[in-house]
Regions:
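Extended interfacial segments that mediate partner engagement and assembly in macromolecular machines
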Residues: 33-43, 49-162, 180
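Short, conserved phosphate/pyrophosphate- and ester-handling motifs at nucleotide-, phospho-/glycolipid
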Residues: 10, 138, 273
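Short, aliphatic-rich beta-strand segments
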Residues: 175, 182-192, 261-265
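Residue-level signal for inorganic ion chemistry
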Residues: 10, 54, 173, 227
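Terminal RNA-binding accessory module
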Residues: 1-47, 123
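Rossmann-like S-adenosyl-L-methionine
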Residues: 194-333
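Short edge beta-strands and adjacent turn/loop segments
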Residues: 167-181
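Internal alpha/beta scaffold segment
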Residues: 127-171, 192-228
Length: 333
């Protein structure tokens, strides 16, 4: 049995085996030779196939749901007796495109020594970055913010952080936008290294002020709640908070789910599909009995509770709800 990532059932592909273990193997995709009969949709995004973010855009959405249902059921069969009898299938997202409320973009280049890029990792590459300024899983405000940011820092010739040399300034751009309130939080993540270009040293505060001013001139559908600058000198290629300053506004925004309002900070966990989360949480509430009965005797434990979203949404259906979370920032939010 060989598993090949980034493929669709029914495709004819060429691949090389790069892992073997206990009678199973993993293969690395080289080329798609023939499409699957299931693929009758054109990819909605021009970056599809190059960007490593999405896998199934050439499948109609209903086929994507069937594929996911099969994958989940196989996982359940390994640990749940008679899984087929209790599995209820997949509930679809109310919105297929433009649904995300958070994106973490990475600075880099698409080819070695090429122009500054800002976006997602190229499929199969640890180093190359694709500028996803036409990405379809976010709305137009994200695309405008990304485009303005990469254009500004390109014009200033600001170096990105090289993951092998551990040199450079620009690391990530974090953008969060509430679907219901349309509030936007923008956070630039950089190192604390001196900013140097071919023309010499750059004043960081003037650079950040210019970026902030550029963002504030954008015509957006939503409203900017805050513009932030976070420092991160960790060697890991991940967004980490080693100190955040507010360049404009505040360091949080609000989102609404099922009639409740939630305060979200830059790094607190929140489901990335707000409308899909409402479906998820409403289903969970129905499972435990959405009685809204003041005499309810149930106690609900929300483990790994993050900002306590599930705990608060389930609270009308229980006498006590207890959230358990190790991340202090999420609890404080």
């Amino acid at each position: 049995e060989v598993t090949v990532k980034n493929t669709i059932p029914g495709q004819k592909v060429s691949f090389v085996i790069n892992k073997k273990r206990k009678g199973k193997a993993e293969g690395r995709l080289l080329e798609i030779l023939e499409k699957s009969e299931l693929e009758n949709a054109e990819a909605n995004c021009p970056h599809y196939g190059v960007c490593g973010g999405c896998n199934y855009q050439t499948l109609p959405y209903e086929e994507q749901l069937k594929l996911k249902a099969g994958q989940v059921l196989e996982l359940m069969k390994a640990v749940v007796p008679n899984a087929e009898d209790i599995f209820e299938g997949i509930r679809k997202s109310p919105q297929q495109f433009g649904y995300r409320n958070k994106m973490e973009y990475t600075f880099g280049d698409e080819v070695k020594d090429g122009p500054l890029a800002l976006g997602m990792h190229k499929r199969g590459s640890f180093y190359d970055i694709v500028t996803v300024d036409e990405c379809r899983i976010v709305d137009d405000d994200y695309r405008k913010i990304l485009g303005a940011t990469v254009a500004y820092f390109r014009a200033q010739d600001i170096p990105f952080y090289h993951r092998m040399r551990h040199e450079g300034y620009l690391r990530h751009l974090l953008v969060r936008k509430a679907v219901k309130t349309e509030e936007i939080l923008i956070d630039l993540i950089t190192t604390t290294q001196e900013i140097r270009t071919e023309e010499g040293s750059v004043d960081e505060q003037l650079l950040l002020d210019g970026w902030r001013n550029q963002l504030q001139t954008l015509e957006l559908d939503g409203s900017i709640a805050g513009i932030l600058h976070t420092k991160n000198d960790s060697v890991a290629d991940a967004v980490k908070n080693e100190g955040t300053e507010i360049l404009y506004g505040k360091d949080y925004f609000y989102e609404e789910l099922l009639g409740l309002k939630f305060r979200i900070s830059p790094f607190s966990f929140f489901q990335t599909n707000s409308l899909g989360a409402e479906v998820l949480y409403q289903t969970a509430r129905e499972y435990i009995g959405d009685s809204l009965d003041e005499k309810a005797e149930k106690t609900v434990y929300d483990l790994y509770s993050g900002t306590g979203t599930i705990a608060q949404i389930l609270s009308p259906a229980a006498k006590h709800v207890i959230g358990v979370e190790i991340v202090e920032e999420a609890v404080e939010a």
